[in-house]
Protein backbone atom coordinates (compact mmCIF):
# COMPACT_ATOMS: atom_id res chain seq x y z
CA UNK A 1 0.00 0.00 0.00
CA UNK A 2 1.35 3.50 -0.83
CA UNK A 3 2.18 5.73 2.14
CA UNK A 4 1.53 9.36 2.99
CA UNK A 5 4.23 10.82 5.26
CA UNK A 6 3.91 14.02 7.29
CA UNK A 7 6.63 15.60 9.41
CA UNK A 8 5.74 18.75 11.38
CA UNK A 9 8.68 21.17 11.39
CA UNK A 10 6.44 23.44 13.47
CA UNK A 11 2.86 23.40 14.89
CA UNK A 12 3.20 19.75 15.95
CA UNK A 13 1.42 19.69 19.35
CA UNK A 14 2.18 23.42 19.41
CA UNK A 15 0.74 26.73 18.17
CA UNK A 16 3.09 28.93 16.16
CA UNK A 17 5.73 28.33 13.46
CA UNK A 18 3.32 26.32 11.28
CA UNK A 19 5.33 24.25 8.80
CA UNK A 20 4.58 20.69 7.67
CA UNK A 21 6.46 18.50 5.22
CA UNK A 22 4.05 16.31 3.24
CA UNK A 23 5.39 13.42 1.14
CA UNK A 24 3.19 11.31 -1.13
CA UNK A 25 3.47 9.72 -4.54
CA UNK A 26 7.13 10.71 -4.79
CA UNK A 27 6.34 14.42 -4.23
CA UNK A 28 7.42 16.61 -1.29
CA UNK A 29 5.20 19.59 -0.44
CA UNK A 30 5.81 22.18 2.28
CA UNK A 31 2.58 23.34 3.94
CA UNK A 32 3.05 26.84 5.40
CA UNK A 33 6.35 28.33 6.56
CA UNK A 34 5.70 30.35 9.70
CA UNK A 35 7.67 31.74 12.59
CA UNK A 36 7.10 31.42 16.35
CA UNK A 37 6.23 34.76 17.94
CA UNK A 38 7.34 33.59 21.40
CA UNK A 39 11.07 33.20 20.55
CA UNK A 40 13.81 35.63 19.54
CA UNK A 41 16.47 33.02 18.71
CA UNK A 42 16.83 30.25 16.10
CA UNK A 43 13.78 28.48 17.58
CA UNK A 44 11.56 31.09 15.95
CA UNK A 45 12.06 29.41 12.53
CA UNK A 46 11.19 25.82 11.53
CA UNK A 47 14.12 23.40 11.65
CA UNK A 48 14.84 23.00 7.94
CA UNK A 49 17.70 20.57 8.67
CA UNK A 50 15.02 17.84 8.79
CA UNK A 51 14.73 18.29 5.01
CA UNK A 52 18.45 18.44 4.28
CA UNK A 53 21.28 18.83 6.88
CA UNK A 54 22.75 21.86 5.13
CA UNK A 55 22.53 23.79 1.89
CA UNK A 56 19.59 24.68 -0.40
CA UNK A 57 16.39 22.63 -0.22
CA UNK A 58 15.10 23.26 -3.78
CA UNK A 59 15.90 19.75 -5.02
CA UNK A 60 14.03 18.23 -2.05
CA UNK A 61 10.78 20.27 -2.27
CA UNK A 62 8.36 20.25 -5.23
CA UNK A 63 6.32 23.23 -4.05
CA UNK A 64 5.41 25.38 -1.03
CA UNK A 65 1.79 26.21 -0.15
CA UNK A 66 0.94 29.16 2.14
CA UNK A 67 -2.56 29.12 3.65
CA UNK A 68 -2.79 32.80 4.74
CA UNK A 69 -0.81 35.92 5.65
CA UNK A 70 -0.51 35.54 9.44
CA UNK A 71 3.15 35.49 10.42
CA UNK A 72 2.92 32.17 12.26
CA UNK A 73 2.10 30.71 8.83
CA UNK A 74 4.29 32.77 6.45
CA UNK A 75 6.84 34.59 8.67
CA UNK A 76 9.78 32.30 7.82
CA UNK A 77 9.14 32.26 4.07
CA UNK A 78 11.85 34.81 3.05
CA UNK A 79 14.31 33.13 5.43
CA UNK A 80 13.60 29.73 3.87
CA UNK A 81 13.74 30.88 0.25
CA UNK A 82 16.55 33.46 0.38
CA UNK A 83 18.83 32.35 3.26
CA UNK A 84 18.33 28.56 3.40
CA UNK A 85 17.83 28.47 -0.38
CA UNK A 86 14.67 27.58 -2.32
CA UNK A 87 13.93 28.57 -5.93
CA UNK A 88 10.82 26.48 -6.60
CA UNK A 89 7.16 27.58 -6.85
CA UNK A 90 5.26 29.05 -3.88
CA UNK A 91 1.45 29.01 -4.01
CA UNK A 92 -0.95 31.33 -2.15
CA UNK A 93 -4.14 33.26 -2.90
CA UNK A 94 -4.13 36.75 -4.46
CA UNK A 95 -5.01 38.58 -1.17
CA UNK A 96 -2.29 36.66 0.69
CA UNK A 97 0.27 37.62 -1.94
CA UNK A 98 -0.74 41.29 -1.61
CA UNK A 99 -0.80 41.48 2.20
CA UNK A 100 1.95 39.07 3.34
CA UNK A 101 4.93 41.24 2.22
CA UNK A 102 3.59 44.23 4.20
CA UNK A 103 3.38 42.21 7.41
CA UNK A 104 6.78 40.64 6.74
CA UNK A 105 8.33 44.09 6.31
CA UNK A 106 6.68 45.38 9.52
CA UNK A 107 8.08 42.39 11.41
CA UNK A 108 11.54 42.89 9.88
CA UNK A 109 11.59 46.53 11.01
CA UNK A 110 10.73 45.56 14.59
CA UNK A 111 13.31 42.74 14.71
CA UNK A 112 16.22 44.41 12.92
CA UNK A 113 15.82 48.17 13.20
CA UNK A 114 14.38 48.33 16.74
CA UNK A 115 15.87 45.24 18.39
CA UNK A 116 19.10 45.11 16.35
CA UNK A 117 18.81 41.40 15.54
CA UNK A 118 21.11 39.76 13.00
CA UNK A 119 20.66 36.66 10.79
CA UNK A 120 17.34 38.08 9.63
CA UNK A 121 16.04 38.59 6.10
CA UNK A 122 16.22 41.98 4.37
CA UNK A 123 13.63 44.08 2.51
CA UNK A 124 15.13 42.92 -0.79
CA UNK A 125 14.86 39.29 0.30
CA UNK A 126 11.13 39.77 0.90
CA UNK A 127 10.76 41.17 -2.63
CA UNK A 128 12.82 38.35 -4.17
CA UNK A 129 10.81 35.77 -2.25
CA UNK A 130 7.47 37.17 -3.47
CA UNK A 131 8.68 36.93 -7.09
CA UNK A 132 8.52 33.14 -6.70
CA UNK A 133 4.83 33.26 -5.71
CA UNK A 134 2.18 31.90 -8.07
CA UNK A 135 -1.26 33.22 -7.00
CA UNK A 136 -4.22 30.82 -7.05
CA UNK A 137 -7.96 31.42 -7.42
CA UNK A 138 -10.59 29.68 -5.31
CA UNK A 139 -11.92 26.37 -6.72
CA UNK A 140 -9.47 26.48 -9.64
CA UNK A 141 -7.48 23.27 -10.13
CA UNK A 142 -3.81 24.03 -10.72
CA UNK A 143 -1.27 21.51 -11.98
CA UNK A 144 2.11 22.01 -10.28
CA UNK A 145 3.47 19.33 -12.63
CA UNK A 146 2.01 16.38 -14.55
CA UNK A 147 1.23 14.46 -11.32
CA UNK A 148 0.70 17.10 -8.61
CA UNK A 149 -2.60 19.00 -8.52
CA UNK A 150 -3.81 21.60 -5.98
CA UNK A 151 -7.10 23.44 -5.41
CA UNK A 152 -7.94 26.22 -2.92
CA UNK A 153 -11.15 26.45 -0.87
CA UNK A 154 -12.52 29.39 1.15
CA UNK A 155 -11.39 29.23 4.80
CA UNK A 156 -12.87 32.38 6.39
CA UNK A 157 -10.43 33.30 9.23
CA UNK A 158 -8.81 36.31 7.50
CA UNK A 159 -8.97 37.95 4.09
CA UNK A 160 -7.51 35.51 1.54
CA UNK A 161 -7.21 32.49 3.87
CA UNK A 162 -7.59 29.18 2.03
CA UNK A 163 -7.74 25.47 2.68
CA UNK A 164 -5.86 23.42 0.09
CA UNK A 165 -6.77 20.09 -1.53
CA UNK A 166 -3.60 18.36 -2.77
CA UNK A 167 -3.66 15.34 -5.10
CA UNK A 168 -0.85 13.13 -6.39
CA UNK A 169 -2.02 10.19 -8.49
CA UNK A 170 -4.86 8.55 -6.59
CA UNK A 171 -3.85 9.98 -3.17
CA UNK A 172 -5.27 13.22 -1.80
CA UNK A 173 -4.81 15.38 1.31
CA UNK A 174 -6.70 18.45 2.57
CA UNK A 175 -4.70 20.99 4.60
CA UNK A 176 -6.93 23.49 6.38
CA UNK A 177 -4.45 26.10 7.59
CA UNK A 178 -6.51 28.25 9.99
CA UNK A 179 -10.25 28.34 9.31
CA UNK A 180 -13.55 29.43 10.80
CA UNK A 181 -16.81 27.53 10.27
CA UNK A 182 -18.89 30.48 11.56
CA UNK A 183 -19.47 33.64 9.46
CA UNK A 184 -18.75 36.98 11.12
CA UNK A 185 -19.36 40.67 10.38
CA UNK A 186 -16.99 40.86 7.44
CA UNK A 187 -16.08 37.30 6.31
CA UNK A 188 -18.07 34.21 5.38
CA UNK A 189 -17.78 30.69 6.82
CA UNK A 190 -15.24 28.16 5.56
CA UNK A 191 -16.51 25.79 2.87
CA UNK A 192 -15.25 22.62 1.21
CA UNK A 193 -16.99 20.00 -0.91
CA UNK A 194 -17.31 16.28 -0.14
CA UNK A 195 -13.85 15.52 -1.55
CA UNK A 196 -13.22 12.41 0.65
CA UNK A 197 -9.42 12.86 1.01
CA UNK A 198 -7.15 10.12 2.31
CA UNK A 199 -6.08 12.57 5.03
CA UNK A 200 -7.50 15.77 6.52
CA UNK A 201 -4.87 17.90 8.31
CA UNK A 202 -6.81 20.27 10.57
CA UNK A 203 -5.82 23.03 12.95
CA UNK A 204 -6.97 22.41 16.53
CA UNK A 205 -6.32 25.72 18.34
CA UNK A 206 -9.66 25.49 20.15
CA UNK A 207 -9.91 21.69 20.25
CA UNK A 208 -11.80 21.60 23.56
CA UNK A 209 -13.80 24.83 23.22
CA UNK A 210 -17.44 25.20 22.28
CA UNK A 211 -17.90 28.94 21.95
CA UNK A 212 -20.82 30.69 23.58
CA UNK A 213 -23.24 32.56 21.37
CA UNK A 214 -21.72 35.33 19.30
CA UNK A 215 -24.33 37.84 20.48
CA UNK A 216 -23.56 37.21 24.19
CA UNK A 217 -19.83 37.56 23.51
CA UNK A 218 -20.30 40.87 21.68
CA UNK A 219 -22.62 42.22 24.39
CA UNK A 220 -20.07 41.34 27.11
CA UNK A 221 -17.25 42.98 25.13
CA UNK A 222 -19.19 46.24 24.62
CA UNK A 223 -20.27 46.31 28.29
CA UNK A 224 -16.68 45.96 29.57
CA UNK A 225 -15.31 48.61 27.18
CA UNK A 226 -18.11 51.06 28.04
CA UNK A 227 -17.74 50.56 31.82
CA UNK A 228 -13.97 51.15 31.65
CA UNK A 229 -14.11 54.37 29.62
CA UNK A 230 -17.10 55.65 31.63
CA UNK A 231 -14.91 55.71 34.77
CA UNK A 232 -12.07 57.45 32.90
CA UNK A 233 -9.99 54.36 32.10
CA UNK A 234 -8.10 53.47 28.96
CA UNK A 235 -8.79 50.27 26.99
CA UNK A 236 -6.03 48.59 24.97
CA UNK A 237 -7.13 46.01 22.39
CA UNK A 238 -4.10 44.25 20.83
CA UNK A 239 -4.97 43.01 17.33
CA UNK A 240 -3.29 41.94 14.13
CA UNK A 241 -3.54 44.40 11.25
CA UNK A 242 -6.22 42.63 9.26
CA UNK A 243 -8.97 40.32 10.46
CA UNK A 244 -10.24 40.62 14.06
CA UNK A 245 -9.28 44.30 13.94
CA UNK A 246 -11.93 45.05 11.31
CA UNK A 247 -14.47 42.81 13.07
CA UNK A 248 -14.12 44.67 16.39
CA UNK A 249 -13.91 48.10 14.76
CA UNK A 250 -17.26 47.51 13.02
CA UNK A 251 -18.73 46.36 16.35
CA UNK A 252 -17.50 49.41 18.33
CA UNK A 253 -18.34 51.86 15.53
CA UNK A 254 -21.95 50.62 15.46
CA UNK A 255 -22.25 50.75 19.28
CA UNK A 256 -20.72 54.25 19.58
CA UNK A 257 -23.15 55.48 16.91
CA UNK A 258 -26.17 53.91 18.61
CA UNK A 259 -25.23 55.11 22.12
CA UNK A 260 -24.01 58.54 20.90
CA UNK A 261 -20.71 58.13 22.79
CA UNK A 262 -17.91 60.69 22.45
CA UNK A 263 -14.93 58.82 23.97
CA UNK A 264 -12.12 58.69 21.38
CA UNK A 265 -11.32 55.41 19.63
CA UNK A 266 -7.97 55.10 17.89
CA UNK A 267 -6.46 52.65 15.45
CA UNK A 268 -2.72 52.24 14.77
CA UNK A 269 -1.67 54.77 12.16
CA UNK A 270 -1.86 53.57 8.56
CA UNK A 271 -3.58 50.27 9.21
CA UNK A 272 -7.10 51.60 8.62
CA UNK A 273 -6.06 52.93 5.22
CA UNK A 274 -4.37 49.63 4.32
CA UNK A 275 -7.43 47.67 5.40
CA UNK A 276 -9.69 49.85 3.26
CA UNK A 277 -7.46 49.38 0.25
CA UNK A 278 -7.35 45.60 0.50
CA UNK A 279 -11.01 45.09 1.36
CA UNK A 280 -11.94 47.17 -1.71
CA UNK A 281 -9.48 45.26 -3.87
CA UNK A 282 -10.66 41.84 -2.69
CA UNK A 283 -14.32 42.58 -1.97
CA UNK A 284 -15.34 39.13 -3.34
CA UNK A 285 -13.62 37.52 -0.33
CA UNK A 286 -15.89 39.29 2.19
CA UNK A 287 -19.36 38.19 3.28
CA UNK A 288 -22.56 38.79 1.31
CA UNK A 289 -23.74 41.78 3.37
CA UNK A 290 -20.53 43.77 2.84
CA UNK A 291 -20.47 42.92 -0.88
CA UNK A 292 -24.04 44.19 -1.27
CA UNK A 293 -23.60 47.46 0.66
CA UNK A 294 -20.01 48.32 -0.32
CA UNK A 295 -21.00 50.47 -3.34
CA UNK A 296 -23.39 52.63 -1.27
CA UNK A 297 -21.64 52.54 2.10
CA UNK A 298 -18.10 51.47 2.89
CA UNK A 299 -18.27 49.59 6.21
CA UNK A 300 -14.60 50.43 6.79
CA UNK A 301 -14.95 54.23 6.56
CA UNK A 302 -15.22 54.73 10.32
CA UNK A 303 -16.73 57.92 11.72
CA UNK A 304 -15.70 57.38 15.36
CA UNK A 305 -12.32 55.68 14.88
CA UNK A 306 -9.32 57.91 14.17
CA UNK A 307 -5.60 57.24 13.45
CA UNK A 308 -3.46 56.93 16.59
CA UNK A 309 -0.33 58.94 17.28
CA UNK A 310 2.26 57.77 19.84
CA UNK A 311 1.98 61.17 21.54
CA UNK A 312 -1.54 60.17 22.63
CA UNK A 313 -0.19 57.42 24.94
CA UNK A 314 0.21 59.85 27.86
CA UNK A 315 -2.95 61.86 27.16
CA UNK A 316 -5.26 62.09 30.18
CA UNK A 317 -8.80 60.77 30.09
CA UNK A 318 -10.58 57.78 28.62
CA UNK A 319 -9.82 56.27 25.24
CA UNK A 320 -9.93 52.98 23.34
CA UNK A 321 -6.91 51.98 21.25
CA UNK A 322 -6.54 49.16 18.73
CA UNK A 323 -2.82 48.46 18.34
CA UNK A 324 -0.69 45.80 16.69
CA UNK A 325 0.53 43.12 17.15
CA UNK A 326 -2.12 40.94 18.74
CA UNK A 327 0.02 38.92 21.19
CA UNK A 328 1.86 41.84 22.84
CA UNK A 329 5.20 40.42 21.72
CA UNK A 330 6.55 43.63 20.12
CA UNK A 331 5.55 46.89 18.45
CA UNK A 332 3.05 49.58 19.41
CA UNK A 333 0.71 47.36 21.43
CA UNK A 334 3.58 46.39 23.74
CA UNK A 335 4.69 50.03 24.13
CA UNK A 336 1.19 51.08 25.17
CA UNK A 337 0.87 48.09 27.50
CA UNK A 338 4.07 49.04 29.37
CA UNK A 339 2.69 52.57 29.93
CA UNK A 340 -0.87 51.65 30.90
CA UNK A 341 -0.38 48.36 32.81
CA UNK A 342 0.44 49.92 36.24
CA UNK A 343 -2.90 51.82 36.35
CA UNK A 344 -5.77 49.80 37.83
CA UNK A 345 -8.37 51.95 36.02
CA UNK A 346 -7.14 50.71 32.66
CA UNK A 347 -7.97 47.48 30.86
CA UNK A 348 -6.44 45.25 28.20
CA UNK A 349 -8.78 42.99 26.23
CA UNK A 350 -7.10 40.06 24.47
CA UNK A 351 -9.43 39.01 21.63
CA UNK A 352 -7.34 36.14 20.26
CA UNK A 353 -5.02 33.25 21.04
CA UNK A 354 -1.54 34.07 22.42
CA UNK A 355 1.29 31.58 21.96
CA UNK A 356 3.56 30.55 24.81
CA UNK A 357 6.41 32.97 25.49
CA UNK A 358 4.53 36.14 24.48
CA UNK A 359 3.55 38.86 26.97
CA UNK A 360 -0.08 38.22 26.04
CA UNK A 361 0.22 34.59 27.10
CA UNK A 362 1.90 35.57 30.38
CA UNK A 363 -0.74 38.08 31.50
CA UNK A 364 -3.57 35.74 30.49
CA UNK A 365 -1.89 33.18 32.75
CA UNK A 366 -2.24 35.61 35.68
CA UNK A 367 1.24 37.21 35.76
CA UNK A 368 1.24 40.34 37.94
CA UNK A 369 4.76 41.34 36.91
CA UNK A 370 6.37 41.04 33.48
CA UNK A 371 10.14 41.18 33.06
CA UNK A 372 11.60 42.26 29.72
CA UNK A 373 14.98 41.62 28.06
CA UNK A 374 16.47 44.91 29.29
CA UNK A 375 15.55 43.85 32.87
CA UNK A 376 12.67 46.30 32.89
CA UNK A 377 9.88 45.02 35.16
CA UNK A 378 6.29 46.16 34.57
CA UNK A 379 3.63 45.72 37.25
CA UNK A 380 0.29 44.58 35.84
CA UNK A 381 -2.45 46.36 37.79
CA UNK A 382 -4.76 46.99 34.84
CA UNK A 383 -7.70 44.61 34.32
CA UNK A 384 -6.88 41.74 31.94
CA UNK A 385 -9.79 40.26 29.99
CA UNK A 386 -9.81 37.43 27.48
CA UNK A 387 -12.71 37.39 25.03
CA UNK A 388 -12.44 34.96 22.18
CA UNK A 389 -13.11 36.77 18.94
CA UNK A 390 -10.51 34.52 17.39
CA UNK A 391 -11.44 33.40 13.88
CA UNK A 392 -10.49 29.77 14.46
CA UNK A 393 -12.84 26.81 14.31
CA UNK A 394 -13.95 25.56 17.72
CA UNK A 395 -14.46 21.84 18.49
CA UNK A 396 -17.93 21.92 16.95
CA UNK A 397 -16.56 23.55 13.78
CA UNK A 398 -13.77 20.97 13.44
CA UNK A 399 -16.29 18.13 13.74
CA UNK A 400 -18.49 19.86 11.16
CA UNK A 401 -15.62 20.07 8.67
CA UNK A 402 -14.84 16.36 9.14
CA UNK A 403 -18.49 15.57 8.44
CA UNK A 404 -18.48 17.79 5.35
CA UNK A 405 -15.42 16.41 3.55
CA UNK A 406 -15.55 12.78 4.80
CA UNK A 407 -11.80 12.03 5.14
CA UNK A 408 -10.43 8.53 5.66
CA UNK A 409 -7.90 9.74 8.28
CA UNK A 410 -7.51 12.91 10.36
CA UNK A 411 -4.38 14.68 11.63
CA UNK A 412 -4.49 17.43 14.25
CA UNK A 413 -1.86 20.21 14.23
CA UNK A 414 -1.63 23.82 15.49
CA UNK A 415 -2.88 23.03 18.99
CA UNK A 416 -1.91 21.94 22.49
CA UNK A 417 -1.25 18.22 23.12
CA UNK A 418 -3.75 17.80 25.96
CA UNK A 419 -6.56 19.41 24.01
CA UNK A 420 -5.67 17.40 20.91
CA UNK A 421 -5.98 14.12 22.84
CA UNK A 422 -9.47 15.05 23.99
CA UNK A 423 -10.58 15.94 20.45
CA UNK A 424 -8.97 12.78 19.06
CA UNK A 425 -11.18 10.64 21.32
CA UNK A 426 -14.26 12.63 20.22
CA UNK A 427 -13.42 12.05 16.55
CA UNK A 428 -12.92 8.33 17.22
CA UNK A 429 -16.27 8.08 19.02
CA UNK A 430 -18.27 10.03 16.45
CA UNK A 431 -16.65 9.10 13.14
CA UNK A 432 -14.53 6.01 13.99
CA UNK A 433 -11.58 7.59 12.17
CA UNK A 434 -7.88 7.08 12.88
CA UNK A 435 -6.61 10.42 14.21
CA UNK A 436 -2.92 11.40 14.41
CA UNK A 437 -1.21 14.21 16.35
CA UNK A 438 2.57 14.06 15.67
CA UNK A 439 5.01 16.25 17.61
CA UNK A 440 7.56 18.50 15.90
CA UNK A 441 10.20 16.41 14.12
CA UNK A 442 8.12 13.22 14.34
CA UNK A 443 7.29 11.56 11.01
CA UNK A 444 3.80 10.12 10.77
CA UNK A 445 3.25 7.37 8.16
CA UNK A 446 -0.29 6.70 6.91
CA UNK A 447 -0.95 3.78 4.57
CA UNK A 448 -3.62 4.27 1.92
CA UNK A 449 -5.30 1.68 -0.34
CA UNK A 450 -4.14 1.43 -3.94
CA UNK A 451 -6.58 3.21 -6.25
CA UNK A 452 -6.23 3.30 -10.03
CA UNK A 453 -8.34 5.88 -11.87
CA UNK A 454 -9.98 4.49 -15.03
CA UNK A 455 -12.17 5.91 -17.78
CA UNK A 456 -15.57 4.35 -18.47
CA UNK A 457 -17.00 3.88 -21.97
CA UNK A 458 -20.13 5.81 -22.95
CA UNK A 459 -22.04 2.63 -23.81
CA UNK A 460 -21.29 1.15 -20.36
CA UNK A 461 -22.45 4.33 -18.60
CA UNK A 462 -25.63 4.46 -20.72
CA UNK A 463 -26.42 0.86 -19.78
CA UNK A 464 -25.83 1.70 -16.10
CA UNK A 465 -28.10 4.76 -16.43
CA UNK A 466 -30.90 2.62 -17.84
CA UNK A 467 -30.41 0.18 -14.98
CA UNK A 468 -30.43 3.07 -12.48
CA UNK A 469 -33.71 4.45 -13.88
CA UNK A 470 -35.30 1.02 -13.78
CA UNK A 471 -34.35 0.44 -10.14
CA UNK A 472 -32.81 3.40 -8.24
CA UNK A 473 -30.28 2.13 -5.66
CA UNK A 474 -30.05 2.97 -1.99
CA UNK A 475 -28.47 6.49 -1.92
CA UNK A 476 -26.49 5.58 1.22
CA UNK A 477 -24.64 2.79 -0.59
CA UNK A 478 -22.02 3.33 -3.26
CA UNK A 479 -23.01 2.02 -6.68
CA UNK A 480 -20.70 -0.53 -8.29
CA UNK A 481 -20.21 -0.65 -12.06
CA UNK A 482 -19.19 -3.98 -13.56
CA UNK A 483 -17.31 -4.24 -16.83
CA UNK A 484 -14.15 -5.43 -18.56
CA UNK A 485 -10.92 -3.51 -17.88
CA UNK A 486 -9.02 -2.86 -21.13
CA UNK A 487 -5.44 -1.52 -20.95
CA UNK A 488 -4.26 -0.11 -24.27
CA UNK A 489 -1.87 2.71 -25.29
CA UNK A 490 -1.22 3.73 -21.63
CA UNK A 491 -4.95 4.16 -21.12
CA UNK A 492 -7.23 2.13 -18.85
CA UNK A 493 -10.87 1.87 -19.93
CA UNK A 494 -13.81 0.07 -18.31
CA UNK A 495 -16.07 -1.26 -21.08
CA UNK A 496 -18.94 -3.65 -21.60
CA UNK A 497 -17.95 -7.12 -22.86
CA UNK A 498 -18.96 -6.59 -26.50
CA UNK A 499 -17.01 -3.33 -26.86
CA UNK A 500 -14.00 -4.75 -25.01
CA UNK A 501 -13.73 -7.75 -27.35
CA UNK A 502 -14.09 -5.49 -30.38
CA UNK A 503 -11.47 -3.07 -29.00
CA UNK A 504 -8.79 -5.74 -28.70
CA UNK A 505 -9.86 -7.70 -31.81
CA UNK A 506 -11.05 -10.91 -30.17
CA UNK A 507 -14.01 -12.95 -31.38
CA UNK A 508 -16.24 -14.21 -28.62
CA UNK A 509 -16.33 -17.99 -28.27
CA UNK A 510 -18.73 -19.86 -26.03
CA UNK A 511 -17.82 -23.35 -24.83
CA UNK A 512 -20.78 -25.66 -24.28
CA UNK A 513 -20.93 -29.08 -22.64
CA UNK A 514 -23.34 -31.67 -24.11
CA UNK A 515 -24.74 -34.92 -22.68
CA UNK A 516 -27.10 -37.41 -24.35
CA UNK A 517 -29.99 -39.30 -22.74
CA UNK A 518 -32.00 -42.00 -24.60
CA UNK A 519 -35.80 -42.02 -24.25
CA UNK A 520 -38.35 -44.62 -25.37
CA UNK A 521 -40.71 -42.69 -27.66
CA UNK A 522 -41.87 -43.53 -31.19
CA UNK A 523 -43.97 -40.38 -31.78
CA UNK A 524 -43.05 -37.24 -33.76
CA UNK A 525 -40.16 -35.10 -32.44
CA UNK A 526 -42.33 -31.99 -31.99
CA UNK A 527 -44.86 -33.88 -29.82
CA UNK A 528 -42.04 -35.38 -27.72
CA UNK A 529 -40.55 -31.90 -27.26
CA UNK A 530 -43.89 -30.42 -26.14
CA UNK A 531 -44.47 -33.28 -23.69
CA UNK A 532 -40.91 -32.89 -22.37
CA UNK A 533 -41.42 -29.11 -21.89
CA UNK A 534 -44.54 -29.76 -19.81
CA UNK A 535 -42.73 -32.31 -17.65
CA UNK A 536 -39.75 -29.94 -17.12
CA UNK A 537 -42.08 -27.08 -16.11
CA UNK A 538 -43.56 -29.34 -13.45
CA UNK A 539 -40.16 -30.49 -12.18
CA UNK A 540 -38.45 -27.05 -12.38
CA UNK A 541 -40.98 -24.82 -10.65
CA UNK A 542 -39.61 -21.26 -10.45
CA UNK A 543 -37.43 -21.64 -13.56
CA UNK A 544 -38.41 -20.15 -16.92
CA UNK A 545 -38.82 -22.94 -19.49
CA UNK A 546 -39.34 -21.76 -23.10
CA UNK A 547 -39.71 -23.40 -26.50
CA UNK A 548 -37.35 -21.98 -29.13
CA UNK A 549 -38.13 -21.54 -32.86
CA UNK A 550 -35.80 -24.42 -33.74
CA UNK A 551 -37.84 -26.72 -31.49
CA UNK A 552 -35.32 -26.83 -28.63
CA UNK A 553 -36.22 -26.12 -24.98
CA UNK A 554 -34.29 -23.37 -23.10
CA UNK A 555 -33.80 -23.09 -19.33
CA UNK A 556 -31.36 -20.18 -18.68
CA UNK A 557 -28.33 -21.09 -20.86
CA UNK A 558 -29.24 -24.78 -20.77
CA UNK A 559 -30.62 -26.12 -24.05
CA UNK A 560 -32.61 -29.38 -24.35
CA UNK A 561 -33.12 -30.76 -27.87
CA UNK A 562 -34.97 -33.90 -29.05
CA UNK A 563 -33.65 -35.83 -32.09
CA UNK A 564 -34.60 -39.09 -33.85
CA UNK A 565 -32.42 -42.11 -33.11
CA UNK A 566 -31.16 -43.23 -36.54
CA UNK A 567 -30.61 -46.82 -35.39
CA UNK A 568 -33.86 -47.32 -33.43
CA UNK A 569 -37.05 -45.49 -34.61
CA UNK A 570 -38.78 -46.34 -31.31
CA UNK A 571 -36.27 -44.22 -29.38
CA UNK A 572 -35.38 -40.55 -29.17
CA UNK A 573 -32.07 -38.91 -28.25
CA UNK A 574 -32.35 -36.02 -25.80
CA UNK A 575 -29.31 -33.68 -25.99
CA UNK A 576 -28.66 -31.43 -22.97
CA UNK A 577 -26.01 -28.67 -23.41
CA UNK A 578 -24.88 -25.83 -21.13
CA UNK A 579 -22.11 -23.28 -20.65
CA UNK A 580 -19.57 -23.48 -17.86
CA UNK A 581 -21.31 -20.58 -16.03
CA UNK A 582 -24.47 -22.72 -15.68
CA UNK A 583 -22.80 -26.02 -14.89
CA UNK A 584 -24.84 -26.53 -11.70
CA UNK A 585 -28.16 -25.97 -13.51
CA UNK A 586 -27.09 -28.19 -16.41
CA UNK A 587 -26.11 -31.05 -14.08
CA UNK A 588 -29.41 -30.74 -12.21
CA UNK A 589 -31.53 -30.83 -15.40
CA UNK A 590 -29.47 -33.79 -16.71
CA UNK A 591 -30.25 -35.65 -13.48
CA UNK A 592 -33.98 -34.83 -13.79
CA UNK A 593 -34.10 -36.12 -17.39
CA UNK A 594 -32.17 -39.28 -16.53
CA UNK A 595 -34.72 -40.08 -13.80
CA UNK A 596 -37.62 -39.37 -16.16
CA UNK A 597 -36.24 -41.61 -18.88
UniProtKB/Swiss-Prot annotation:
One of its GO terms (molecular function) is RNA endonuclease activity. Changing residue 517 to M: Rescues lethality in Ints11 knocked-out larvae. Mutant adult flies have a shortened lifespan and locomotor defects. GO terms for biological process: RNA polymerase II transcription initiation surveillance; snRNA 3'-end processing; snRNA processing. Its EC number is 3.1.27.-. Changing residue 138 to F: Rescues lethality in Ints11 knocked-out larvae. Mutant adult flies have a shortened lifespan and locomotor defects. 1D-myo-inositol hexakisphosphate binds at residue 462. It is found in: Nucleus; Cytoplasm, Cytosol. Zn(2+) 1 binds at residues 68, 70, 157, 178. SMART domains: Beta-Casp, Lactamase_B. One of its GO terms (cellular component) is nucleus. Zn(2+) 2 binds at residues 72-73, 178, 414. The active site is at 203. Disruption phenotype: IntS11 knockout flies live for 5 or 6 days, show developmental delay and die as L2 larvae. IntS11 knockdown reduces viability of adult flies and results in locomotor defects. Expressed in neurons and glia of the larval and adult brain. Changing residue 203 to Q: Abolished RNA endonuclease activity. Changing residue 553 to E: Rescues lethality in Ints11 knocked-out larvae. Mutant adult flies have a shortened lifespan and locomotor defects. It comes from the Eukaryota. Pfam families: Beta-Casp, IntS11_C, Lactamase_B_6, RMMBL. A motif (HXHXDH motif) lies at residues 68-73. Its cofactor is Zn(2+). Changing residue 396 to E: Rescues lethality in Ints11 knocked-out larvae. Mutant adult flies have a shortened lifespan and locomotor defects. Keywords: Cytoplasm, Hydrolase, Metal-binding, Nucleus, Zinc. Belongs to the metallo-beta-lactamase superfamily. RNA-metabolizing metallo-beta-lactamase-like family. INTS11 subfamily. Belongs to the multiprotein complex Integrator, at least composed of IntS1, IntS2, IntS3, IntS4, omd/IntS5, IntS6, defl/IntS7, IntS8, IntS9, IntS10, IntS11, IntS12, asun/IntS13, IntS14 and IntS15. The core complex associates with protein phosphatase 2A subunits mts/PP2A and Pp2A-29B, to form the Integrator-PP2A (INTAC) complex. IntS11 is part of the RNA endonuclease subcomplex, composed of IntS4, IntS9, IntS11 and inositol hexakisphosphate (InsP6). RNA endonuclease component of the integrator complex, a multiprotein complex that terminates RNA polymerase II (Pol II) transcription in the promoter-proximal region of genes. This is Integrator complex subunit 11. The gene is IntS11.
Amino acid sequence: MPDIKITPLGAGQDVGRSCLLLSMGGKNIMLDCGMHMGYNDERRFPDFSYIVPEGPITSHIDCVIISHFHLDHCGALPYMSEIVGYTGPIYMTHPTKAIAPILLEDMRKVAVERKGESNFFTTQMIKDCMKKVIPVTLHQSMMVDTDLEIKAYYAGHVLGAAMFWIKVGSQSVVYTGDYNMTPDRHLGAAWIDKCRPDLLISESTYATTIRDSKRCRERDFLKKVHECVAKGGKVLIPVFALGRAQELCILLETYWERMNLKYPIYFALGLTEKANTYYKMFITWTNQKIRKTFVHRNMFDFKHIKPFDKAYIDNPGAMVVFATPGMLHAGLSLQIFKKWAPNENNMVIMPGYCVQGTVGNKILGGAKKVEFENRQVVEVKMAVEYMSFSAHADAKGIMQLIQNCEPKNVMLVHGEAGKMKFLRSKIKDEFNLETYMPANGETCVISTPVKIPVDASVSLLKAEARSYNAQPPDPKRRRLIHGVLVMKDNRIMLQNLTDALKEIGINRHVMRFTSKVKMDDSGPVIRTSERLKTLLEEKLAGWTVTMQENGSIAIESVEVKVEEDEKDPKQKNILISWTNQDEDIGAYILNVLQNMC
